[in-house]
Amino acid sequence: MNQASAIAILVIFSLASGYLLGSIIFADIFSKILKKNVREFGSKNPGATNSMRVFGLKIGFLVAIFDAFKGFFAFLLTWILFRFGLQGYLTEKVYQSTYFLSYLSCFAATIGHIFPLYFKFKGGKAIATTGGSLLAISLWWFLICLLIWIMITLITKYVSLASLITFFVLAVIILIPWLDYLYFFNSDPLKSITYQNEWYIILFFCLWYWPLTVVVFWLHRANIIRILHGKESKITQLN
């Protein structure tokens, strides 16, 4: 196999596996198991927060965990293929300039959650799936965003507002080269202290994360209107 073929397989596998995994909507799966359609109650969104409203905190928490796992597992599969299969066909120079393409699986997983193949392309808002993707990409991103999300949720009691603010903050911290420490490919703990990412890798993440942020804000347009009018459901109103 030549290098071009190896890179093509990496890109195709990343996008295909990520999208197919992301298309698994666990809120809909629990709907079938519990014989109660989450899309017919509450906000009608097949996501973790509405699952808490409809099915209770335990089921909603499971939906959040499973949705987040999609984003992480999609990357993990791609990383295994790349690390133990395709990498051997690449020179060191080509490897250093292409390994980050593995993270296309994270992008594809979020798109799959929003536009799922198995559910007529009508999915959720990809908050938890994005969280799982961040855990796969950079622990700094994940921890910063998790702390911000928890803080805003506790202060305002609005999960939707916390999610939107967190997405906005992430759109900014992506630009900080010291924070996007791609630990799956940089396993030396000491390197995390002096780490600084390449500009083209930062651009890569911006090119898919910034448009995703716009999509997520659009999907939350009804939530934004309800927040402005003081009609958005608070987390204290969950079961």
UniProtKB/Swiss-Prot annotation:
Enzyme Commission number(s) from the entry: 2.3.1.275
Topology in membrane: Multi-pass membrane protein
Keyword terms, alphabetized: Cell membrane, Lipid biosynthesis, Lipid metabolism, Membrane, Phospholipid biosynthesis, Phospholipid metabolism, Transferase, Transmembrane, Transmembrane helix
Pfam families reported in the protein's UniProt record: G3P_acyltransf
GO biological process: phospholipid biosynthetic process
Metabolic or biological pathway, per its Swiss-Prot or TrEMBL entry: Lipid metabolism; phospholipid metabolism
GO cellular component, one term: plasma membrane
Domain of life: Bacteria
MF annotations from Gene Ontology: acyl-phosphate glycerol-3-phosphate acyltransferase activity
Matching InterPro entries: G3P_acylTferase_PlsY
Entry's family note: Belongs to the PlsY family.
Xref: HAMAP family: PlsY (MF_01043)
Function: Catalyzes the transfer of an acyl group from acyl-phosphate (acyl-PO(4)) to glycerol-3-phosphate (G3P) to form lysophosphatidic acid (LPA). This enzyme utilizes acyl-phosphate as fatty acyl donor, but not acyl-CoA or acyl-ACP.
Quaternary structure, from the entry: Probably interacts with PlsX.
Family matches, as PANTHER family: GLYCEROL-3-PHOSPHATE ACYLTRANSFERASE-RELATED, INNER MEMBRANE PROTEIN YGIH
Protein's name according to its UniProt entry: Glycerol-3-phosphate acyltransferase
Native species: Mycoplasma genitalium (strain ATCC 33530 / DSM 19775 / NCTC 10195 / G37)
